[in-house]
């Protein structure tokens, strides 16, 4: 089981955490949403729970809850800039289909 980050994603998360002034790492999860069923959730985490699995890559701790882990195993998080837009991009080998707008996915 693994969650990995690109160099640019790790740098961006570290910048966010430094600006925030505190935090254990980044929580990655999924929630029911959109036309394809699931959407990614990213948020800061100050302390993991007993049900969480913690991954570390490039100095960043990524926390995943037990329910989300089955859908996220093997995911790589990247941070990309495309024209005027920038944001995190998920490369998830478990995804079978995405909605047309890219906001949700199905495994």
From Swiss-Prot:
Keywords: Iron, Metal-binding. It holds the Pfam family Fe-S_biosyn. Binds 2 iron ions per dimer. The dimer may bind additional iron ions. Fe cation binds at residues 35, 99, 101. InterPro entries: Fe-S_cluster_asmbl/transfer (IPR050322), FeS_biogenesis (IPR000361), FeS_cluster_insertion (IPR016092), FeS_cluster_insertion_CS (IPR017870), HesB-like_dom_sf (IPR035903), IscA_proteobacteria (IPR011302). One of its GO terms (molecular function) is iron ion binding. Transmembrane segments: none annotated. Its cofactor is Fe cation. GO terms for biological process: iron-sulfur cluster assembly. The keyword Transferase does not apply. GO terms for cellular component: cytoplasm; cytosol. The keyword Aminoacyl-tRNA synthetase does not apply. Is able to transfer iron-sulfur clusters to apo-ferredoxin. Multiple cycles of [2Fe2S] cluster formation and transfer are observed, suggesting that IscA acts catalytically. Recruits intracellular free iron so as to provide iron for the assembly of transient iron-sulfur cluster in IscU in the presence of IscS, L-cysteine and the thioredoxin reductase system TrxA/TrxB. Belongs to the HesB/IscA family. Homodimer; may form tetramers and higher multimers. This is Iron-binding protein IscA. The lineage of its organism: Bacteria, Pseudomonadati, Pseudomonadota, Gammaproteobacteria, Enterobacterales. The gene is iscA.
């Amino acid at each position: 089981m693994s969650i990995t980050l690109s160099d640019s994603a790790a740098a961006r998360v570290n910048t966010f955490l430094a600006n925030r002034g505190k935090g254990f790492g980044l929580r990655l999860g999924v929630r029911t949403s959109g036309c394809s069923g699931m959407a990614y959730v990213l948020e800061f985490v100050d302390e993991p729970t007993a049900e969480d699995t913690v991954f570390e890559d490039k100095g960043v701790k990524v926390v995943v809850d037990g329910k989300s882990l089955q859908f996220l195993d093997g995911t790589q998080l990247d941070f990309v800039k495309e024209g005027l837009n920038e944001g995190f991009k998920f490369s998830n080998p478990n995804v079978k289909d995405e909605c047309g707008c890219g906001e949700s996915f199905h495994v």
